[in-house]
Amino acid sequence: MELEILLPFPSAETMTESWAFSEAQIDFRHDPEAGARCTISYAAVELRTHLLQMEPDAQICFVSQRHNGKAAIELHADSLTASGDAYALLPQKDGLLIRGAGRVGVLYGVYEFLKMQGWRWLEPGTAGEYAPEPGCGLLWPKNAVHDASASTLGRGF
């Protein structure tokens, strides 16, 4: 299986893993764009890590531009400065668009997609992680999935 994870940032091919773990260098309140890049990159790394556990022989790469004909999961935030946690999983011709209202929505959308694959997290760390059997293939949603917090304050504190 070949899959592209499309991020909305130039240089995603080489910088995604670095951005994903740069939270200690970012002031999320004063530099929300850098915060969004960090969170969305972390979501991409989580997605690739978990999908590779399901499909160890897969070739999954990060890209900033989609290549025609390749399956792709596109990560998109409606706003890089908003803190919205709503998300949508939108089936596309050759993949999936995970669209969040903000950076947190993208992360929640990635975890929802992984839950569809059979992943469960019963407690923090790998000890509380339930993984689907390797080689079972990807399950693509047939219909759009939408979710938004019922609270205007978000899902938690």
Where are each of the predicted segments found?
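Acidic, contiguous N-terminal accessory segments
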Residues: 1-91, 136-146
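Feature activates predominantly on carbohydrate-active enzymes
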Residues: 34, 40-46, 50, 82-84, ...
